[in-house]
C-alpha cells in the first residue's frame, strides 16, 4: 500500500515531535511543517504554525493553508512552476481526508527531490525497504512527468532575417512550412532568372552557360538540402512531440537546427549576391543583344507573368493558410481557456455549492445564535431572579428552619414541662403530705420541747433544793461528826453531783440543739412554701406559653433562670443537710456516752435517789425525742432525694439543650455547604457563559473568513470573465 510507504518515509525523518501510525495524524500540519523545515529551511519556519487549539478544524485548516502557500512559493521561485498545488483542498485535509493528504505528501516529495537537501532525502529513501522504495520511485516518476511538459522550453523558429521566435510545437510546424514555401518561391524566381540569363547568353559566350549550369546545380543541391532540412525538421518535430522528457537532447537538436538554418541563411545570402552579379552581367549582355532576344524575353516575360500570377495565387493561399493557422491557434487557445474554465467552473461550482451550503448554515447558525442570545438573556434574567429568590429563600429557609426548630424545641420543652409539672405536682402532693407530717411532728416536738423545758425547770429546782440540802447536810456533818461521813459524802455524793452536773450540761446542749432543729425545720417549711409558690408560677407560665407562642424564648430564659435558682437552693440545702448530719453525729456521740454512763450506773448498786430515777426517765424521753428527730431527718433526706431527682431531670434538660445546640451547629454547617454549592453553581454558570461566548466568537471569525473567501472567488471569476486570455498570457509571460 502506498499509504504505509508514505508513513515509513515520513517516520524516516529525524527530530520529529512524534512518529505517526496513520495519515490522519497529519491533518493538524505540525509534522508536515517539521518535514518541510528539514527539506527547505529557507521557506519554512517551525514557529510559524499554531500548536494550541488543534482540536478545532479551523485552526488546522489555517496551518495547512500556510504550508501549501510555502510549497507553492518554492515551486514558483525554485522551479518556475505555477498552479502545481491548486487542486489541493485544505479544508478536506483538516477534516482528515486521506486522498487530499496523499496529494500534499506527493507535492512535498516533489519539492524534496528538487531541493538543495535532495541527497539526504534520497539517502532516507534508500534506507527503507525495497517495497517502499519502489512505491516512492513510482510516485517520483509520476511527479517528474507532470512537471516536465511545463518546464521544457518551447520550440523556436526562424524568420527570413534569422531572428528567433518562441513558439509552440504547432506554431513551429506552421512556420517551417511557411519558410519552405518561401524558399520554393525564391528558388523558382532564381530558376527563372537563370533561365532567362542562359537564353540571353547562349549566343554570347559558353562561359555564361557553364556558370548558369553550375548555378542550377547549386540550386538543385540547395533544394535537396532544403528537403533534407525539412525532413530533419519533421524528424525534430516528431522527436519534440514524442521526447518531452529529455531536455538535453532537445537542446542539442535545437542547436543543430539553429546552425543548419544559419548556414542555409548565409548560403542563401551568397547565392543572392551571385544572382545580382549575374543579373548585372546579363543586363550588359542584353544591351548588346536586345533586338535578338526581345522576342524570347517577351515570351519569357509572359511565362514569368504567368508564373508570378501563380506565385501570387500561391502567396494568397499561403496567407490564407497563415490566417487559418492563426485562427486555429486562437481557437486552440480559446479551447484551452474554455477547458480550463470548464475545469475551474466545476471546481468553482462545487465550491459555490459548498459555500452556499455554508452560507445557508451560517444563516441558520445566525438565527440559532440570535435565538441562543435571546435564550441566554432570558436565562441570565432567570438566573438573576433565581439568585435573588435563592438569597430570599435562603433567608426565609433559615428563618423557617429556625422557627420550626424553635417550635419543635418549644413543643418538646412544653411536653417536658408538662411532664415536669406532673412530676412537680406529684412532688408537691408528696411535699404537702410530708409537710403535714412535718407539721404534726413539729407540733409534737414543740409540745415535747415545752414538756422538756418544764421538766428541766422542775429538775433544776429540785437540783437546787437538793444541792442546798446537801450543802446544809455537809455543813452539819462537818460540824457534828468526823471523817467517815466526809469520806462517804466525798466518795458517793460528789461523783453523783458531778455526773448530774454533766447531765444538766448535756441536757442544756440537747435543748439548744432542739431549738436549732426547730429553726432548721422552719427554714425547710419556708423553702417548701417558696417551692409551692414557684410551682404555681410555673403552672401560670405554662398557661401563658400555651396562649402565646411568640414569647417562648423569654419563657425558656425564665425557666433556665428558675432552674439555676433551684440548683442554688439545692446546694444550700445540701450544705444544711451536711451540717445537720454533723450535728446528728455529735448528738449520737453524746448519746453513746450517756448510754455508757447508764450502763455503769445500772452495774452499780441500786442505791439511787428518786432524783436519779427521774433523770433516767428524762434521759429515756430524750432518747425517744432523738429517735423522733432522726425520723424527721430521714423524711428530710427523702425530700432531698426527690429534689436531687428533680435536679437530675433539669440536668437532662440541659443535656437535651446541648444536643439541640449540636443539631443547630450541624444545620449551620449544612447551610454553609449549600451556600458553597450555590457559589460553585454560579461559577459553573459563569464559565459556561464565557465558553459559549468564545464559541460564538470562533464561529463568527470562521463565517467572516468564509465570506472573504467567497468574495475573493467572485472577484477572480469576474476578472477571468473579463480577460479570457489572461491565463495563457500569464503562462507565456512565465
UniProtKB/Swiss-Prot annotation:
Low complexity: compositionally biased ranges: 163-207
Main location: cytoplasm
Gene Ontology cellular component list: centrosome; cytoplasm; microtubule; microtubule organizing center
Name assigned to this protein: Protein hook homolog
Keyword annotations from UniProtKB, A to Z: Coiled coil, Cytoplasm, Cytoskeleton, Microtubule
Tagged with keyword Coiled coil: yes
PROSITE patterns in the cross-refs: CH (PS50021)
Residue stretches of biased makeup (Polar residues): 146-155
GO MF term (any one): dynein light intermediate chain binding
Matches recorded under SUPFAM superfamilies: Hook domain (SSF116907)
Protein role: Cytoskeletal linker protein involved in tethering membrane bound organelles to the cytoskeleton.
GO biological process: cytoplasmic microtubule organization; cytoskeleton-dependent intracellular transport
Domain notes: The large coiled coil domain may mediate homodimerization.
Region (Disordered): 146-208
Localization of this protein: Cytoplasm, Cytoskeleton
Family membership noted in the UniProt record: Belongs to the hook family.
Sections of the chain in a coiled coil: 200-245, 291-700
InterPro entries the record matches: CH_dom, CH_dom_sf, Hook_C, HOOK_N
Summary of subunit composition and partner proteins: Homodimer. Interacts with microtubules.
Pfam families in alphabetical order: HOOK, HOOK_N
Domain Calponin-homology (CH): residue ranges: 1-113
